[in-house]
């Protein structure tokens, strides 16, 4: 992020607490904005895949000549990525302008960091008179700011264990939190083959139009789409199912041809991103690690794998790395990369009983140098966190003399 925007966020927002709060104060501030809502709002939640789905739906709209505002989190390179218009990041000046507007509103002092950012996005979208808003839930659903709106379509891509300290210890606990984005008489699309009871109960209670793999007969096109991507695992079955169902339930009715085109051509950075012989994937929970290993078995048989790992402070590195036993002998652990990532010594302490040769790497520079000298027939895996993926991408772009932007990432493939 350029200095001006970065400095303002650091001084005015980063000291705001991240604690999950009731939405009462948020809804009061939101109401004061008197927003004019678009023709359609799509609200996308889920443990894994919601960011990918948000990008794909945005691309469907963009290629249909619709104006679309997209709100996602977290970001890889710059804060600006969280707010996009027709797939393009918000400019620094406009972002700062709307952040200041929200910060100066009455009652905004009690809002947390994420609530301020989301209000700035909605206020900006409102000024542009867009056709469609694509809004990603940050975590859970019940207390997410975007749940203050009235979506036309709600989506839960998949429910898996993650953020248990906030959402609960079981799949059903987490599903109950996510189910709160459902609306009466409106479509609730669920990508999981097995729909948790908490979601079934919520949908039944409020009479949502539940659309899932268990209760929806697949069209020939959808069957072929799922089969096509099952060979590579590049996009999960859950995401593809949700994308197809959104396209058919949306008032804009996106074509099958466009679904296929967008699915094949949209670059999902930090999600199985293969650049040369380096795979950058932000897998950061047990479910996404399983998907990554499936992808490795399908695409990198008999290849030597170099695993570079760093995870967020709240994660359990033991659970994330144990599935690689028997597949990888040594793991390069990244340290001093980002202040949200777990210190090296703590990772080692939590993984001491795993059967790996751990090698400490004290900077992103050291990791990048190791990747650069790897042999062409080796595959480097950069995994464990969006923060880790983002820092690696930044170093890669700097090394090639490219600006830190998503459009620059598109040039790397």
Question: What is each stretch, according to the model?
Answer:
Residues 47, 68, 134, 157, ...:
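Residue-level signal for inorganic ion chemistry
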């Amino acid at each position: 992020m350029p200095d001006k925007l970065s400095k303002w966020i650091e001084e005015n927002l980063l000291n705001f607490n991240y604690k999950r709060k009731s939405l009462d104060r948020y809804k009061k501030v939101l109401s004061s904005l008197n927003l004019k809502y678009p023709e359609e709002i799509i609200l996308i939640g889920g443990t894994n895949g919601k960011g990918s789905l948000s990008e794909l739906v945005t691309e469907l709209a963009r290629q249909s000549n619709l104006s679309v505002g997209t709100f996602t989190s977290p970001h890889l390179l710059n804060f600006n990525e969280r707010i996009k218009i027709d797939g393009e990041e918000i400019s620094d000046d406009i972002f700062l302008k709307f952040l200041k507007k929200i910060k100066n509103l009455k009652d905004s002092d009690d809002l947390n960091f994420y609530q301020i950012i989301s209000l700035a996005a909605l206020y900006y979208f409102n000024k542009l008179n867009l056709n469609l808003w694509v809004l990603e839930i940050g975590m859970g659903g019940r207390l997410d700011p975007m749940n203050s709106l009235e979506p036309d379509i709600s989506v839960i891509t998949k429910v898996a264990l993650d953020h248990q300290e906030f959402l609960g210890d079981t799949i059903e606990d987490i599903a109950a939190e996510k189910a709160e984005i459902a609306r009466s008489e409106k479509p609730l699309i669920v990508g999981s083959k097995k729909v948790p009871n908490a979601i079934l109960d919520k949908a039944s209670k409020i009479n949502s139009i539940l659309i899932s793999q268990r209760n929806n007969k697949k069209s020939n096109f959808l069957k072929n789409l799922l089969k096509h991507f099952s060979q590579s695992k590049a996009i999960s079955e859950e995401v593809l199912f949700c994308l197809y169902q959104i396209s058919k339930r949306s008032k804009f009715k996106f074509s099958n041809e466009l679904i296929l085109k967008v699915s094949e051509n949209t670059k999902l950075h930090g999600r199985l991103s293969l650049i040369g012989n380096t795979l950058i994937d932000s897998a950061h929970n047990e479910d996404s690690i399983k998907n990554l290993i499936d992808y490795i078995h399908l695409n990198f048989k008999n290849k030597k794998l170099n695993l570079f790992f760093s995870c967020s402070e709240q994660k359990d590195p033991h659970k994330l790395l144990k599935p690689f036993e028997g597949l990888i002998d040594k793991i390069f652990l990244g340290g001093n990369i980002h202040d949200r990532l777990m210190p090296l010594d703590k990772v080692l302490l939590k993984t001491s009983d795993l059967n790996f040769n751990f090698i400490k790497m004290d900077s992103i520079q050291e990791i990048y140098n190791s990747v650069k000298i790897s042999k062409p027939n080796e595959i480097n895996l950069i995994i464990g966190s969006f923060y880790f993926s983002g820092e690696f991408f930044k170093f890669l772009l700097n090394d090639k003399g490219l600006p830190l932007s998503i459009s620059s990432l598109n040039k790397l493939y």
